[in-house]
């Protein structure tokens, strides 16, 4: 009998159909074709029993197929992965969200006096993107914490807090440390992960599985949008008993159902983005990304992707912070990418973009289809627009981040960078 060892079950899919997950303090002893599991704790000498589980991964999902690399494949899979995270959970006919993984903790979750979302890297950005809708629908304080900083500060956690832990792999060390800290404080914990057998999914009280499938590229793409939707669904589910939010919830649920088809429309921008990267962007090594409200999280995620994949310096800035010496940089003509889709902040964002144009900047504007406000500037060559479909404000960031994923990808391709294995990544390399 052969045994394979791995930190990620996806890498074993081509070799095995069954797996055993080890837990903390487990020691696996393989000898003479047999597996024995012991506990490393002093005084524990008995063998441990761990359940053998079926590995539910399709080999086709961890191959590139017709795509050049995994990152490109995973960007295009977002039409399907956003459907998968909602399948069986979002009912557009009754305007309800059903989350079976949380049902047993319904009473405790709806009694929450504070919600804390804890994550790292891109998962942290998805929490920032979802925070405003939690605050609006739940009407309780909502904190978003970087997992490492959260543990370092020994944050105050109480029994009536609900702590949501978001991780692509479910094995992020800093996030697991934060989870253990919150469990000791007796807070209710929710896991939002892609891997159902992961540490976070096993140790949290309840959770939501994003059903994203394996993400082989180092850069988080489809997991970000799936986490975003999963968090919005949690906010909708937890606020179901608030009568004052019924109409707002209906609006969001109806918008959720058409997000996958709208993503398909956004992906049609790829030829324009390829041309933009080739003619205007690839010679630059500094980028500024502007966003406000829901779109500040989009700016953060876009800047992170450009650093990670394209090896360029990119900075995300709140649009109204332009006056704090940022406009001085704009006159040096670094590419400026501004999120200007329609929401409560549109007039102020338009004013900031006008200031950039006055200083001879040539911003790239991500706006909604049919938004004619920059038509004259576009004809004069002062701006470039990337038009995306319009949706409800709290979901617009899902559509807005995809052009940034494509820009990061094609900048890297133009520079002959291996997008699936970027240098100096803090994450483990996938089995490609």
From Swiss-Prot:
Gene3D superfamilies: Glucose-6-phosphate isomerase like protein, domain 1. GO terms for biological process: fructose 6-phosphate metabolic process; protein N-linked glycosylation; UDP-N-acetylglucosamine metabolic process. Pfam families: SIS. The keyword Repeat applies. It comes from Saccharomyces cerevisiae (strain Lalvin EC1118 / Prise de mousse). CDD domains: SIS_GlmS_GlmD_1, SIS_GlmS_GlmD_2. The keyword rRNA-binding does not apply. The lineage of its organism: Eukaryota, Fungi, Dikarya, Ascomycota, Saccharomycotina. This is Uncharacterized protein EC1118_1M3_2531g.
């Amino acid at each position: 009998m052969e045994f394979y060892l791995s930190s990620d079950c996806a890498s074993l899919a081509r070799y095995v159909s069954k797996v055993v997950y080890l837990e903390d303090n487990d020691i696996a002893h393989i000898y003479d074709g047999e597996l024995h599991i012991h506990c490393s704790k002093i005084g524990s000498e008995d063998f441990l029993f761990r359940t053998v589980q079926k590995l539910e991964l399709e080999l086709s999902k961890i191959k590139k197929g017709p795509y050049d690399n995994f990152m490109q494949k995973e960007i295009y899979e977002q039409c399907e992965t956003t459907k998968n995270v909602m399948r069986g959970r979002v009912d557009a006919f009754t305007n309800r969200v059903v989350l079976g993984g949380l049902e047993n903790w319904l009473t405790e979750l709806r009694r929450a006096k504070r919600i804390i979302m804890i994550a790292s890297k891109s998962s942290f950005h998805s929490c920032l993107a979802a925070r405003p809708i939690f605050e609006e629908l739940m009407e309780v304080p909502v904190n978003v914490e970087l997992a490492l900083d959260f543990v370092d500060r020994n944050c105050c956690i109480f029994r009536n807090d609900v702590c949501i832990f978001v991780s692509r792999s479910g094995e992020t060390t800093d996030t697991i440390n934060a989870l253990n800290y919150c469990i000791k404080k007796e807070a209710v914990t929710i896991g939002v992960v892609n891997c159902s057998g992961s540490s976070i999914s096993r140790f949290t009280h309840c959770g939501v599985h994003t059903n994203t499938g394996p993400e082989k590229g180092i850069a988080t793409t489809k997991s970000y949008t799936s986490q975003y939707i999963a968090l919005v669904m949690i906010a909708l589910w937890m606020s179901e008993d608030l009568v004052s939010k019924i109409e707002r919830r209906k609006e969001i649920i109806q918008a959720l159902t058409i997000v996958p088809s709208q993503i398909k429309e956004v992906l049609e921008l790829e030829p324009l983005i390829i041309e933009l990267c080739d003619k205007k962007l690839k010679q630059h090594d500094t980028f500024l990304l502007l966003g406000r409200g829901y779109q500040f999280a989009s700016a953060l995620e876009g800047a992170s992707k450009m650093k990670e994949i394209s090896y360029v310096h990119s900075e995300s800035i709140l649009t109204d912070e332009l006056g704090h010496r940022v406009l001085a940089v704009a006159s040096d003509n670094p590419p400026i990418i501004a999120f200007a889709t329609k929401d409560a902040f549109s007039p102020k964002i338009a004013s900031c973009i006008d200031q950039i144009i006055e200083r001879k900047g040539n911003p790239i504007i991500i706006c909604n289809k049919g938004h004619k406000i920059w038509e004259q500037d576009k004809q004069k060559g002062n701006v470039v627009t990337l038009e995306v479909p319009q949706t409800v404000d709290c979901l617009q960031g899902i559509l807005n981040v995809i052009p940034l994923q494509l820009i990061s990808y094609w900048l890297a391709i133009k520079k002959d960078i291996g997008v699936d294995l970027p240098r100096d990544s803090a994450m483990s390399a996938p089995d490609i």
